Swiss-Prot record:
The keyword Secreted applies. Expressed by the venom gland. Coiled coil: none annotated. One of its GO terms (cellular component) is extracellular region. It is found in: Secreted. It comes from the Eukaryota. It comes from Tityus obscurus (Amazonian scorpion). This is Toxin To61. GO terms for molecular function: toxin activity.
Length: 10
């Protein structure tokens, strides 16, 4: 999901 803007977790 939006993990790419947090550090690639989603």
């Amino acid at each position: 999901k939006e993990g790419y803007l947090l550090g690639s977790r989603g």
